[in-house]
Amino acid sequence: MIAELRQYTLHPGRRDELIELFDREFIESQEACGIRILGQFRDLDNPDRFVWLRGFDSMESRPKALNDFYTGPVWKANSAKANATMVDVSDVLLLRPSAPHTGLTAAQDGSPDSVFLLTLYLRDQPFDEAFLAGFDRTVRPRLPSEPLACLQTEHAENNFPSLPVRSGENVFVWLARFKNVSQLEDWTRPDAISLSRQELRLTPTAGSRLR
């Protein structure tokens, strides 16, 4: 499985407009092209950020699936409306599971008030078995439930260059679900991993299958 983590910066006040359009037009139409829409989210701490993930069976299947969607009728009919809400869509990571059975699937339901913590670690060298063992020892036991996904940079060349992705980076991403904002706020973050990181507190959109 190959995943894209996409963080969009939007024009002020236009996030709900894009979400309504996305949930209505861009889920089934992408999946008809062989793309798995894994989840769509609002960033609780940035009202102008929209975060979503999509998946592909493999790097080899990715270019055809994307070409079929972006040259297809649904994107052509709605691209101008979508693009009008966006300031920057270049913050995109190409990811793969860090170990067997750590990829993300959309068929995972939580509580109606679920909130997600998406954490990105960055370092100079690739994330290796020693790091993964340390994560399993220090972070995983402190989570309220098993991480929904643990992913890391896919270093293969971007084979759909008309959609840029971040390159030359080593990123490890994990996604966890909490019952509500209070549970997340009460959670004590382990400090054993002293790496540069980004944390996103996310709530699913109405159309997100990951909830």
Say what each PLM segment does:
Residues 1-51, 55-76, 80-211:
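Short S/T/G/P-rich N-terminal loop/turn motif that feeds into the first structured element of a domain
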